């Protein structure tokens, strides 16, 4: 007897295509065929049903969200702290997402990595699918422009158009599954192969910050191209060290064979508003003029806003950061004004 994953026939949407893709990644469902029907008797033959049937019951493997009274979110299911009403994609992700991520990455992935990916992928990939399928707008008021490039819109384009025959609907659904699945798998692998290694580098730099300076307010990373801002703020919250007031980050600039001294922004969304900009007397200076003013050899530049500067050597960059801390602490009123 054929094992079946059931979903509805007719026009399909991103949520059930994605739900079916996720289920097919799991050992217990990978050999199941997909039955698209609205016939209740046929659906009863299915081992698991998504986006049809009017029932959400994890114990019975039924994952619909259209029934009256359904209001579940990741928070109500005690999975994550998100309040967007779930679609069939979110329901399947809530219960099987960690296992799906592990399978895509080949298994034996650490639980800490899976937990981070599970949260991040819901926030950046799955939640919008839930919201769009449930008619939840991303903003209040009239949109300023139209966008049809989201995953839900692009997945919907696999449906037959009004002037095309509909005799290949199941094949088109498979194509939609493949499309959304490739997008999701790419996102998972990016996290594992690019995002996670960067996070490990930044976390190690944060943990070793007292080796750079006794204040613990300077962190240094050897990998100049490593993205740091998002990871830094996440790690700061996770380690509960926001009160430590980490102020500067130093990193190598392989392009110019020098080092950078960058002021930590006030939050991850800011670029020019910083906890402590580099000293006002240094700003806009370059080369010998900067070295003379700062008293530190090897000066390269300091941006006119004070958010970043440079030195020819690692030691020079550390010296700039240390002196900037001293000057900033000596001028608390001026520092507060610059932070506004």
Swiss-Prot record:
The lineage of its organism: Eukaryota, Metazoa, Ecdysozoa, Nematoda, Chromadorea. Belongs to the MYG1 family. This is MYG1 protein C27H6.8. It comes from the Eukaryota. One of its GO terms (cellular component) is cytoplasm. It comes from Caenorhabditis elegans. Disulfide bonds: none annotated.
């Amino acid at each position: 007897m054929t094992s079946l994953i059931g979903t509805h026939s007719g026009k399909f949407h991103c949520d059930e295509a994605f739900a079916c893709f996720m289920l097919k990644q799991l050992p217990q469902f990978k050999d199941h065929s997909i039955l698209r029907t609205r016939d209740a008797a046929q659906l009863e033959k299915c081992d698991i049903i998504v986006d049809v049937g009017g029932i959400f019951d994890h114990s019975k493997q039924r994952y619909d969200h259209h029934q009256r009274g359904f209001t579940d979110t990741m928070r109500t299911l005690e999975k994550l702290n998100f309040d967007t009403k779930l679609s069939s994609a979110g329901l399947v992700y809530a219960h099987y997402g960690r296992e799906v991520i592990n399978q895509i990455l080949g298994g034996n992935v650490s639980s800490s990595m899976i937990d981070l990916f599970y949260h991040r992928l819901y926030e950046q990939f799955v939640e919008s699918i839930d919201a769009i399928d449930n008619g939840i707008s991303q903003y209040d008021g009239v949109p300023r422009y139209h966008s049809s490039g989201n995953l839900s819109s692009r997945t919907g384009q696999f449906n037959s158009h009004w002037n095309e025959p509909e005799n290949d609907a199941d094949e088109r659904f498979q194509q939609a599954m493949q499309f959304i699945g490739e997008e999701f798998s790419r996102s998972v692998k990016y996290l594992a192969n690019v995002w996670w290694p960067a996070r490990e580098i930044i976390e190690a730099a944060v943990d070793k910050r007292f080796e750079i300076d006794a204040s613990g307010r300077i962190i240094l990373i050897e990998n100049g191209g490593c993205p740091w801002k998002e990871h830094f703020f996440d790690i700061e919250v996770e380690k509960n060290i926001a009160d430590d007031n980490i102020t500067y980050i130093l990193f190598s600039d392989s392009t110019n064979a020098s080092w950078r001294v960058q002021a930590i922004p006030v939050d991850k969304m800011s670029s020019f508003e910083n906890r402590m900009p580099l000293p006002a007397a240094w700003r806009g200076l370059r080369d010998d003029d900067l070295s003379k003013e700062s008293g530190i050899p090897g000066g390269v530049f300091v941006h006119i806003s004070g958010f970043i500067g440079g030195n020819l050597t690692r030691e020079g960059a550390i010296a700039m950061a240390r002196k900037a801390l001293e000057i900033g602490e000596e001028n608390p009123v001026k520092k507060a004004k610059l932070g506004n």
